[in-house]
Amino acid sequence: MEETLTYSYNIPSVLQKADGQDELRLAKYSEIQKPSDAPCFFIGQVKQPFMMARCLLALANVVKASFNLSPAQLALLKDPIVSAGYERVRFEGFSHCAGVYARLDILPEGLNGDFLQSGTTNVDFNQPMLSALAGIRNNETVTLSVGQKAVGLHLENQQIIERKVPLPVKWIKGLSSVQVYLAQSENSFTLSKIQAQQLFRSLPKGQVRTDYYLVMRGNMQQFSPVKSASAICIGGLHRLRLLEPLLPFIDKLQVFAHPQMQSTTWQLYMGEMRFSLSLSRDCWRGFSGEGATLDALNEGIDEGWLAIFNEQAQANQTINPAFFSSPGGAWLSKTDTLSAQLAAMGLLGFDLEEGTYFYRQLPFKLSRILGLNPRLKGAEKLIVDEKVAIVSQQAGRTEARVAGSGVQHTVIIDASGERCTCEWFSKYQGERGPCKHVLAVKKYLLMK
């Protein structure tokens, strides 16, 4: 059975019409913070309700999609996460296979209201809700309520009620990994609306089983099965069809690529909204199974650092690491490491357009988040069981032996990287993060 984290709310969230405008009110829950007197996160008007509905439908299509699971597994659908803060409302979700991540950012200019408090909650997108969203018109009066135990969409002639769903643990792990990739990604291509539509018309039919590349041919961008200079690699190209319903409404498209081609992100700009779609390297690889966060989590986090960070994050809702290296925060030298650690915990998302982290208040204790990764727990157990032995350590090179199941693994860490004789490293060569034996050796060295 899939592991889930269940939480509830003391008050409902509501999206309703007031003076001909939409007002969105999001309630909160947290197991680490006491409830406040604020009834919701955000109260205000949504200036583009039709576009919001179209984007939420596209996000829902991502959530109910899977590119490596059976129909029986697809019956276990889950629903998006919503964050409000820094004068923005963000909707996030993963495909069920966790290999596609989507986010809708509604920017300050697209909202007219008050942020009473920042926070994160969940919403429910089952079929009755999707059907109601699909029928929304520009001039229609719409009320959406997201409460403790139910979600309601109130239209002129009907009312849709959906029950809440638990939050998948897979999503917490995916939220952490994908932000690490986003923070390392760079803008590779910018396309106009016409260029984007021309490019997407050239998508191959059916499921694509080989890698494709986005290349420049003359002054046009094209998909090609042949790699060329400055091309970016796209695994599972057919997954981009999830963006097709939004293409008629965009102003432009920007494509961001990870330096090692571990992910690509396709960001659509639509007035005061941005919709981004991130693809994992391959269809069968979900972001939740990636090891991008393991090194950061393995270094540990001082609770005093977290307390100071939380104060700053809750006040500003955006993270500028320069703050921690300023005179007032000179005590913290590893600013990049701290940012990576917090992103690895799912507490930070990354905004590609602005090049900054935004704060996401996950409603779970640190110990629960840190306990989600089996490789990290496996590494800690190897240390507790005294199965790590340092053979030599000199001139920037460390060699260690780690006891496995009836075999001794050799771990070498030097200037050229990290290597292990285990099956995991032989199969993935470090592309999916370090194995538990490498993690154990690195943590053991930190403890010495």
Please identify what each model-predicted range represents.
Residues 1-448:
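Long, low-complexity, compositionally biased intrinsically disordered regions
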